[in-house]
Amino acid sequence: MLQSAASTIYLRRITIMAQNIQAALQQLNTLILGKEDVLKQLLACILADGHVLLEDVPGVGKTTLAHGVAAVLGLDYRRVQFTNDMLPSDLLGINIYRPNEGKFEFHPGPVFHSFLLADEINRASPKLQSALLEAMEEKQVSVDGRTYRLPKPFIVVATQNPTEQLGTFPLPESQLDRFMMRLSMGYPAAEAEKMLYFHGDRRRVLPKIQPVCNAETLTAWQQHAAQTKFAQAAADYVFRLVQATRQPGLFVTGLSPRAGLAVVNAAKAWAFMHGRGHVLPDDIKAVWISVTNHRLRPLQQGGSSTQLLNGILNHVAVQ
């Protein structure tokens, strides 16, 4: 009886949280037209305490999307335009000597914001990229031998233009692996683009966005999402999917266990944001491509990673 009552209360809490997340999604749909799936993937990644790489051509709304997500989640937002002459101290912060006090004072850099947009990350030097990715992984930074904790939550959305090569430093595979998801907005659908031209620049909608939570609430949501039940059958399904990427003839190397764990965590968040306390196979399928497509390099003439990953989804049975 008590267990049943506790289960009812738990499901009620999840339902209320999911309703707030849906309210956030509705507002974002007025800002970014016709891209609901990308919005849902991004929100799921944040609920899973992951970071996102937005890879797309300029002018499709990447910056507006990031700003809108930060606003609707009530997070402290900062955009940094990466360039090849930026130093790690420009991002992390610096110690400044105060002669009147006879001591150094730490001035935190942009990385000490809850929501950081790292714009054009592939224009940053490898040293700066490494500093950011270390902060993403460790949730802390070290400056002059002293360690500083980053805020909770700490979310990085990085952007890059896949078509530009001149003056860029492509992220190595080991660093791409630090991003839970890679997403692409693509050009808007015809009707959405017509609406954009008719109604004007969507950035004017940004001041109208109302936060559905704050940093503390979002951290609690992340904790609840992490507690979503993941049955043995679901774990076996993820294992078979990951194993399928390691078969000869598809990719240079298959998915690592870390990638498999990212699929698990993203699927938990996907189930949570849809008001469920347990993961279904469809939740795993929903996040599979976004979580894995940037971690794999197809063998020559083997098709794109997305095509191959979709093929794996179609061939690996749910048992």
Residue ranges: model-predicted function:
Residues A18-V57:
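Pre-Walker A (pre-P-loop) alpha-helix and adjacent loop at the N terminus of AAA/AAA+ ATPase modules
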Residues Q41-A44, Y97-L117:
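Conserved alpha-helical scaffold flanking the Walker A/P-loop in AAA+ ATPase domains
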Residues L47-T83:
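Walker A/P-loop
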Residues V52, L116, F154:
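Conserved beta-strand position immediately N-terminal to the Walker
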Residues D56, D119-E120, A131:
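Walker B catalytic acidic pair
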Residues R98-K103, E120-L128, M136-C213, T219-T228, ...:
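Canonical AAA+ ATPase core
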Residues K208-V263:
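Conserved AAA+ ATPase small/helical "lid" subdomain
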Residues Q247-Q319:
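C-terminal engagement/docking regions of AAA+ P-loop ATPases
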